[in-house]
């Protein structure tokens, strides 16, 4: 059983919903990343999604784009991100860490070299935004051979064929993008999410995390009423951008604790 599977099994046994926060590695400053990861756990995160900075993050809105730019300006690389996961693992052996990013940095390192390095660092899942599941079989096998779950996105526009393709290659969980558009988009249509999830579950025998458009305890709780897990990203990255210097870690912990409380209520 992978760390991600164990986490979702424990949540199901307690009838709880998963909380999956996203932060960009190296933002707002590189020295804070490991502390921020621990703050997320202290606040009640079940899985951490760690964004790998990239110069052209096409699926991301302006908030996460700016975070990527700040991290890259500070010289943050994929190798550095793996080092932070290794450091986090020195004192946390239980919380799954999922890297989320784009194909380019992985391909520059080489898929096999990346899979080996990520597995050795303690990475549990990898979500490559621009890897279509139909063309990912060998990549998925490479990930699993190194103890990593390949995670894929589904969207309101995903066809049955795409959902089936994800069902064949994904493990861990799938990430359902609840809105058309980029991360940080505004309104959330709960009814359409609720209608879509059973169709996904027909083809994908995995927990479904729902993200995009979740900004506060209220929207998190609404999504938690229909999904297995709630993914929250842009709102956290915005919070870190706005937090006064020296207060980022505690601000993040407190915000996540509020979301956790709402999910468990």
UniProtKB/Swiss-Prot annotation:
GO terms for molecular function: tryptophan synthase activity. The keyword Amino-acid biosynthesis applies. Its EC number is 4.2.1.20. One of its GO terms (cellular component) is cytosol. InterPro entries: Aldolase_TIM, RibuloseP-bd_barrel, Trp_synthase_alpha_AS, Trp_synthase_suA. CDD domains: Tryptophan_synthase_alpha. The active site is at residues 49, 60. Pfam families: Trp_syntA. Pathway: Amino-acid biosynthesis; L-tryptophan biosynthesis; L-tryptophan from chorismate: step 5/5. It is an enzyme of class 4 (lyase). It catalyses: (1S,2R)-1-C-(indol-3-yl)glycerol 3-phosphate + L-serine = D-glyceraldehyde 3-phosphate + L-tryptophan + H2O. Keywords: Amino-acid biosynthesis, Aromatic amino acid biosynthesis, Lyase, Tryptophan biosynthesis. Tetramer of two alpha and two beta chains. Belongs to the TrpA family. The alpha subunit is responsible for the aldol cleavage of indoleglycerol phosphate to indole and glyceraldehyde 3-phosphate. This is Tryptophan synthase alpha chain. It comes from Cupriavidus pinatubonensis (strain JMP 134 / LMG 1197) (Cupriavidus necator (strain JMP 134)).
């Amino acid at each position: 059983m992978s760390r991600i599977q164990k986490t979702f099994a424990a949540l199901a046994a307690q009838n709880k919903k998963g909380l999956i926060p996203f932060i960009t590695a190296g933002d707002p400053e590189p020295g804070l990343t490991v502390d921020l990861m621990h703050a997320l756990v202290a606040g009640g995160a079940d899985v951490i999604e760690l964004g790998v900075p990239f110069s052209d993050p096409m699926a991301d809105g302006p908030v996460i784009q700016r975070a990527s730019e700040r991290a890259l300006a500070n010289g943050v690389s994929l190798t550095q991100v793996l080092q932070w996961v290794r450091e986090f693992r020195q004192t946390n052996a239980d919380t799954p860490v999922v890297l989320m990013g784009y194909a380019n940095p992985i391909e520059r390192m080489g898929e096999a070299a990346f899979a080996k390095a990520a597995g050795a660092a303690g990475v549990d899942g990898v979500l490559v935004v621009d890897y279509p599941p139909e063309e990912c079989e060998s990549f998925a096998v490479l990930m699993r051979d190194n103890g990593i779950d390949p995670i894929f996105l589904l969207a309101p526009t995903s066809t049955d064929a795409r959902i089936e393709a994800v069902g064949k290659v994904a493990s861990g969980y799938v990430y359902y993008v609840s809105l058309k558009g980029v991360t940080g988009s505004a309104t959330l249509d709960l009814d359409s999410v609720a209608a879509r999830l059973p169709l996904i579950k027909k083809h994908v025998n995995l927990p479904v995390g729902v993200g995009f458009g979740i900004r506060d305890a209220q929207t998190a709780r609404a999504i938690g009423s229909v999904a297995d897990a709630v993914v929250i990203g842009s709102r956290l990255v915005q919070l870190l951008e706005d937090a006064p210097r020296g207060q980022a870690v505690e601000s993040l912990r407190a915000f996540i604790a509020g979301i956790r409380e709402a999910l468990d209520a």
